[in-house]
Curated annotation (Swiss-Prot):
The lineage of its organism: Eukaryota, Fungi, Dikarya, Ascomycota, Saccharomycotina. It comes from Candida glabrata (strain ATCC 2001 / BCRC 20586 / JCM 3761 / NBRC 0622 / NRRL Y-65 / CBS 138) (Yeast). This is Protein BCP1. It comes from the Eukaryota. The gene is BCP1. Keywords: Cytoplasm, Nucleus, Protein transport, Transport. Residues 1-43 are annotated as: Disordered.
Length: 276
């Protein structure tokens, strides 16, 4: 059953998607204002209101949009190492939350999915993760050997202009759904794949000679920023986190975090966003 929630409800629970309420106006306004003029207070400001609804992942509607967002998350090179269609199917068969603005039949602007590692450890994506880095391989192998700890493979991506206010309810909803699917128990650990970017990356220079690329790497080594601001907080409390090599300005990011630390990170992120 497709469900939705208003952003104003802060995402603690999903509400039933009653057809008679599909056109109901959301109570939250995510607004942007033009305040460039010094005397903007004396002028009429333009306000753009956007209503965001949270839905369960829908294989019949969301497949192609989720596949596109996965490709955006992994980047052009890593995407070629993963079976994207199979991964999209896996995501949409797992506890997944999407965010839309034009009703349940529209394309999602954002998704967050918790893939049960134990149930899908033989999937193409799990095999891909084990080959990425010995730290991930060792962690997953430990889970396989002990057998008494659960783990979610977390995938999340969104359009670049999505407001950060959606992140906290997005995670809380999906954690609640994942626990409900596991007899009320949350996952013990989460393996999060994300991405960063080189702030000063120059595509023209990247296409030049090798020495130019090498010099650029040295100059821009510390000039790295986050696509997902919440990753700063995840890394702060992570058991393990590391970055991959820069590929045309894109840097893969990997985080292993336990449940309590994930909850703490989300709470801290919510508090930080409230001050922006």
């Amino acid at each position: 059953m497709v469900q939705a929630i208003k952003l104003s409800e802060l995402g603690n629970r999903k509400r039933r998607n009653d057809p008679v309420n599909e056109d109901e106006e959301s109570e939250i306004d995510i607004s942007s204002t033009d305040s460039e003029e010094e005397n903007a207070g004396d002028e009429e400001q333009e306000i753009v209101n956007i209503d965001f609804d949270f839905f369960d992942g829908n294989p019949d509607v969301d497949f192609h949009a989720v596949k596109h967002l996965i490709r955006q998350l992994l980047g052009p090179q890593e995407s070629n190492r993963v079976q994207l269609s199979a991964l999209s199917d896996l995501i949409l068969s797992s506890p997944t939350t999407t965010i839309k603005t034009d009703g349940k039949e529209s394309d999602p602007y954002c998704f967050l999915s918790f893939i049960n590692y134990k149930e899908n450890k033989d999937s193409d994506y799990a095999k891909y993760l084990r080959k990425l880095d010995t730290r991930i391989e060792t962690f997953l192998q430990t889970l396989d050997n002990t057998g008494n700890k659960s783990c979610a493979l977390v995938m999340s991506e969104r359009l670049i202009n999505m407001p950060p206010e959606v992140v906290t309810p997005l995670y809380r909803i999906t954690m609640e759904d994942a626990a409900a699917a596991n007899e009320g128990k949350p996952f013990d650990f989460y393996v999060i794949v994300s991405r960063k970017y080189e702030v000063n990356f120059d595509m023209d220079e990247a296409e030049g000679d090798a020495s130019a690329r090498s010099k650029k790497r040295v100059r821009g080594k510390s000039e790295v920023d986050y696509f997902h601001e919440e990753d700063r907080f995840f890394e702060k409390h992570a058991k393990v986190h590391f970055d991959g090599e820069s590929k045309k300005g894109l840097i893969a990011s990997y985080i292993i975090i336990d449940h309590d630390s994930l909850v703490k990170s989300i709470n801290e992120f919510e508090q930080e966003v409230s001050t922006w």
